[in-house]
């Protein structure tokens, strides 16, 4: 179920047995997540006639999805992707379908819509963390795994760019609720195709056999801290860019191009990062990449005009996907074999929680502080996270010691292999 290559490349990743089918299925399901936020927001606002109600319901949906993610991931680790993801996807798709039906015409009670949205968010299948755990099973070469994670991260970035565009196309000839319905359909089809892949079936068997007293080691703290710092920075950037453009008389269409430039920079940075043979370890690279993002954003606040700001934002984007890719790699290294989905979910939760918090903080500070100070604070969040992790890495390097979690993971691996040999 694993593959290695003498010349690690993105093509080698996709040539790994079952990789293309599994990855494609996961992307189909994850496209739903790129669509659902805008689709629900538009559908609820149309049904209730209130942007305030739509915003509250969307926030509740997002909170249920984000903060319960580690719990859902733990269920996947415990029961395997097939037994855990299918019920989650069925509930999630069914609830989104209910929400689509309720918002198809105006007049739906806000309380009913909020209840359905929260329930749907609570059932969101952790397809991203599960796919990254599957990459760890498909690819044993760490160099190839870096490319797999980079490819996964860039693809996810593109999904969250193309998802809103797809919603925009749909609302051109159908009610906004159609976007919610399509989102439900995508997650159902994608999850079913994903869990029936031979690669995922193998993960399910192995995950159910591994037992651990301590499933996630202390090493998970470092990637979670960096992910939270990156999320805080990214969450603040959107409002800061919007305020920067408005102060100089530019419209929303111009802002959209700057956001696209950030995503493009992240995609290019992720692909280049994954293609490099790095000598430094992942824990050394992790704070360095977060620091690069923080410095780029701090400098962006000094931009005299929109063109310069766009260039600075592109430079910041170069560090986004690499930083998150490395965070997921470190989380994977820190987790026991049967806890990889949960480890990835903690990083994912940290990013999303950071984005929400950063956006809220920026909303309070924009207009009260100069733009330069706002960008400095946004960059400072990533820099602070980088500094905290760099200190812990330096201490671990200077005072090396055996890590208990590593010993436990080795014992788990030995127990898992012994059980597999006994049942073969």
Please give the residue ranges for each predicted region.
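Helix-to-loop junctions at the C-terminal end of transmembrane segments
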Residues: 67-81, 171, 268-282, 366
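Helix-loop boundary and gating motifs at the non-cytosolic
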Residues: 5-66, 214-260
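Cytoplasmic helix-loop-helix junction between adjacent transmembrane helices
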Residues: 116-158
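C-terminal transmembrane helical hairpin of 12-TM major facilitator-type secondary transporters
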Residues: 283-327
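C-terminal ends and interior cores of transmembrane alpha-helices
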Residues: 90-107, 292-304
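Intracellular juxtamembrane helix-capping segments at the cytosolic ends
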Residues: 40, 125-139, 241, 322-335
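A late C-terminal transmembrane helix in Major Facilitator Superfamily
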Residues: 338-371
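A membrane-interface helix-boundary motif in multi-pass transporters
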Residues: 109, 172-185, 364-383
């Amino acid at each position: 179920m694993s593959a290695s290559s003498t010349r690690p490349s993105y093509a080698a990743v996709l040539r790994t047995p079952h990789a293309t089918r599994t990855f494609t299925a996961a992307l189909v399901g994850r496209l739903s997540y790129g669509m659902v936020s805008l689709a629900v927001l538009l559908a609820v606002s149309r049904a209730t006639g209130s942007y305030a109600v739509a915003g509250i319901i969307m926030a509740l949906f997002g909170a249920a999805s984000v903060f319960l993610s580690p719990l859902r991931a733990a269920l996947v680790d415990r029961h395997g992707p097939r037994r855990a993801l299918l019920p989650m996807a069925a509930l999630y798709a069914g609830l989104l379908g209910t929400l689509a039906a309720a918002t198809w015409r105006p007049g739906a009670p806000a309380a009913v819509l909020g209840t359905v949205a929260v329930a749907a968010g609570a059932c969101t299948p952790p397809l991203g963390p599960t796919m990254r755990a599957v990459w760890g099973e498909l690819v044993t070469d760490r160099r190839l795994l870096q490319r797999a994670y980079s490819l996964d991260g860039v693809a996810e970035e593109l999904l969250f760019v193309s998802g809103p565009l797809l919603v925009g196309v749909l609302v051109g000839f159908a009610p906004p609720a159609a976007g919610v319905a399509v989102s439900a359909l995508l997650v159902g089809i994608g999850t079913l195709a994903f869990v029936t892949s031979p690669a995922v079936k193998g993960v399910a068997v192995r995950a159910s056999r591994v037992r651990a007293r301590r499933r996630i080691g202390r090493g998970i703290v470092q990637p979670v801290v960096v992910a939270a710092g990156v999320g805080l920075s990214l969450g603040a950037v959107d409002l800061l860019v919007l305020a920067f453009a408005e102060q100089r008389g530019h419209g929303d269409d111009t802002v959209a191009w700057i956001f696209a430039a950030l995503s493009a920079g992240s995609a290019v940075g992720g692909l280049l990062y994954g293609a490099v043979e790095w000598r430094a370890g992942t824990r050394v690279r992790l704070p360095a990449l977060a620091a690069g993002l923080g410095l780029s954003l701090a400098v962006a606040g000094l931009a005299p005009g929109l063109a310069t700001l766009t260039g600075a934002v592109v430079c910041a984007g170069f560090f986004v996907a690499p930083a998150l890719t490395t965070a997921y790699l470190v989380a994977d290294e820190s987790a026991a074999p049967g806890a990889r989905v949960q480890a990835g979910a903690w990083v994912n939760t940290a990013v999303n929680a950071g984005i929400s918090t950063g956006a809220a903080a920026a909303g309070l500070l924009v207009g009260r502080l100069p733009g330069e100070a706002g960008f400095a604070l946004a960059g400072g969040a990533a820099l602070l996270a980088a500094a905290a992790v760099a200190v812990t890495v330096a201490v671990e390097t200077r005072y090396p010691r055996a890590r208990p979690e590593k010993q436990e993971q080795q014992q788990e691996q030995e127990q898992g292999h012994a059980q597999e040999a006994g049942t073969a």
